[in-house]
From Swiss-Prot:
The keyword Transport applies. CDD domains: ATP-synt_Fo_b (cd06503). The gene is atpF. GO terms for cellular component: plasma membrane; proton-transporting ATP synthase complex. This is ATP synthase subunit b. InterPro entries: ATP_synth_B-like_membr_sf, ATP_synth_b/b'su_bac/chlpt, ATP_synth_F0_bsu_bac, ATP_synthase_B_chain. The chain crosses the membrane at residues 7-29. Its main location: membrane. F(1)F(0) ATP synthase produces ATP from ADP in the presence of a proton or sodium gradient. F-type ATPases consist of two structural domains, F(1) containing the extramembraneous catalytic core and F(0) containing the membrane proton channel, linked together by a central stalk and a peripheral stalk. During catalysis, ATP synthesis in the catalytic domain of F(1) is coupled via a rotary mechanism of the central stalk subunits to proton translocation.
């Protein structure tokens, strides 16, 4: 193999080409590749962080949902207790009102009965006086006396 000037010129040109590429072309390419690698790594880290944040958010959401359900069930339970209390109070008030009305009715009946008795006593007394006057006006005769008593009792 003969080494001639062309081969030597090509070797020198290749050496300058490699040196030029190593000094001016290679660093920007490596920098672009490294930037790309850094972006990819940052993206992977961000994706991992986002996945963790998503899991945390889902856990928080499920916890808040449980708390909301618990609070809602407590509210429903309190509402049911209050409803039962209101119903019981209404029943007690209705019972008290019923007893009050019944007592008033019984008192009114008793008052009316006493008034009727007093009126009847007055009438009986009046009739007895009238009967006694009639008996005294007439002669004392058993038949007339019995007849007058029958009339008085009939009037009673």
């Amino acid at each position: 193999m003969n080494m001639n000037a062309t081969l030597l010129g090509q070797a020198i040109a290749f050496f300058f080409f490699v040196t030029f590429c190593m000094k001016y072309v290679w660093p920007p390419l490596m920098e672009a590749i490294e930037e790309r690698q850094a972006k990819i790594a940052d993206g992977l880290v961000a994706a991992d962080r986002a996945a963790k944040d998503l899991n945390l958010a889902q856990a928080n959401a499920s916890e808040q949902l449980k708390e909301a359900k618990h609070a809602a069930s407590e509210l429903i339970e309190q509402a049911n207790k209050r409803r039962a209390q209101i119903v019981d109070e209404a029943k007690a008030e209705a019972q008290a009102e019923r007893e009050k009305i019944l007592a008033q009715g019984l008192a009114e009946i008793e008052s009316e009965r006493n008034r009727a008795r007093d009126e009847l006593r007055k009438q009986v007394a009046t009739l007895a006086v009238i009967g006694a006057e009639k008996i005294l006006e007439r002669s004392i005769d058993k038949d007339v006396h019995a007849e007058l008593l029958n009339k008085v009792t009939a009037e009673l």
